[in-house]
Design a protein with these regions (language model features):
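Sec-dependent bacterial lipoprotein signal peptides
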Residues: 1-15
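Long, terminal "pre-/pro-" and other extracytoplasmic accessory regions
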Residues: 17-207
């Protein structure tokens, strides 16, 4: 009667010896940080929300993209946008940035103030705030317009040509305008095309 338990014990020991040891789990490869770019209008929405928390009457008078290693603006988008908002009631202004990049030449991801508060003069027409309802045409649409007025030839000639975008109010024409700048700055730009930010229509070639 003792043979059965002994045989069963032998089978258990044999199974234990023959089973394979668990294999070590391979470490999961670390994924690179997600790099995000946005059109000007999409970035403006994020910046506007932050500015309204800063001051309830905050209004923007300038929005501009930045050129970085990860984002050169050729698709109508940027990984970094900077906006300057004014509080007419308090007579102050403050810049904010949105960043979707983790590069060393870009601000930390997210929305944050980009500097201290400064004085603001509501009577200064060069820094006249605009109403958000005028912003209907986006930066990528403005790029398409600029491409038809000299931009296409520039990008075809130089695949690495950066493109910047500036949004501000034109007090002479009482309209909001995009400035599509083929270059890192307005002064040394190869081309600067103004586009109506409400209708998306071509306005003029500024350079």
């Amino acid at each position: 009667m003792r043979r059965a338990p002994l045989a069963l014990l032998a089978l258990v020991l044999l199974a234990g010896c023959s089973s394979e040891a668990p294999k070590p789990v391979a470490p999961v490869a670390k994924q690179p940080p997600q790099q995000e770019t946005l059109t000007g209008r999409m970035a403006f929405q994020k910046l506007y929300q932050a500015a309204r928390l800063w001051n309830a009457d905050a209004r923007c008078f300038r929005l501009e993209s930045a050129i970085t290693k990860e984002s050169n603006g050729r698709d109508g988008k940027s990984g970094v946008w900077r906006a300057i908002f004014a509080s007419p009631g308090r007579g102050i202004a403050r810049p904010f940035t949105w960043s979707g990049l983790t590069a060393d030449d870009a601000p930390n991801p997210g929305v944050a103030p980009a500097g201290p508060e400064d004085s603001f003069n509501p009577a200064n027409t060069s820094t006249q705030p605009f109403d958000i309802v005028y912003l209907k045409a986006d930066s990528d649409q403005s790029l398409e317009v600029a491409q038809k007025h000299g931009g296409e030839a520039i990008l075809k000639k130089d695949p690495n040509q950066p493109v910047r975008y500036i949004l501000d109010w034109n007090p002479k024409k009482s309209q909001l305008e995009w400035h599509v700048i083929y270059g890192t700055a307005e002064l040394d730009a190869k081309l600067n095309v103004a586009v109506n930010a409400s209708s998306g229509d071509f306005v003029r070639v500024e350079k």
